[in-house]
Swiss-Prot record:
Similarity-based family: Belongs to the TACO1 family.
Residues annotated as signal peptide: none
Protein name: Probable transcriptional regulatory protein Cyan7425_4347
Any single GO CC term annotated in Swiss-Prot or TrEMBL for this entry: cytosol
Main localization category: cytoplasm
Lineage: Bacteria, Bacillati, Cyanobacteriota, Cyanophyceae, Gomontiellales
Keywords, comma-separated and alphabetical: Cytoplasm, DNA-binding, Transcription, Transcription regulation
Species for this entry: Cyanothece sp. (strain PCC 7425 / ATCC 29141)
Highest taxon of the lineage: Bacteria
One BP term from GO: regulation of DNA-templated transcription
Cellular compartment(s): Cytoplasm
Single GO MF descriptor: DNA binding
Amino acid sequence: MAGHSKWANIKRQKARVDAKKGAVFARLSRAIIVAARHGIPDPEGNFQLRSAIEKAKAAGIPNDNIERAIAKGAGKLGADSELEEIRYEGYGLGGVAILIEAMTDNRNRTAADLRAAFNKHGGNLGETGCVGWMFNQVGIVTIAAPADEEAFLEVLLEAGADTYELIETEEGTIAEIVTEVTNLEHLATVLKAQHYPVREAESRWVAINMVEISDPEQGRRLLKLMDALEDLDDVQSVTANFAIGDNLLTEMLV
């Protein structure tokens, strides 16, 4: 029986992983469709599309899927549901501000799904503009940590970057470089020309001020809310203005 139970657990875990992977593929494919629809369906002349394709390839999406998404966006595969980009805003437990970017072909469905997730985890979906002023949109380029930081700084100055941060990840140290959204393509182009392989180039919302969470129960519920929102099919990204310190995070995981 123990073996059977373990096999059942493994199957459930694999199903969760497969579902998560499928959701990521769908999310990235939608981004390609919208990028191709908004501009020309040629990545060489469409930076948004080029960035979406690079992100999709990094996630392991097959080339056939990518080409099909581009063709859909260009209208070459017949009638397709019109996807639109919508920004939603709301509050988590304790008044934490949350900003959600979605792509949907049904606003009513998306709003209902978001409202249900907020309500389940102690938050509420707000009106447009209720928390948007608490965030700025910036351009962010991600690369592997540079070996020569002094030379790297010179390149950043030339490219018009604002700031950068070194971040430890499971795959090693990366550098996240922040710039104005309007300068994102130029920054990515300069970095590539100077032989810094760009892992990701995207616009992102960042909180102007962060709220430090001190209550472990509030922290747990906020993280559950973020997970629930990110798991929704129509959601592309979720940004919040709270931070959890390492000590509290350790306490929460015990």
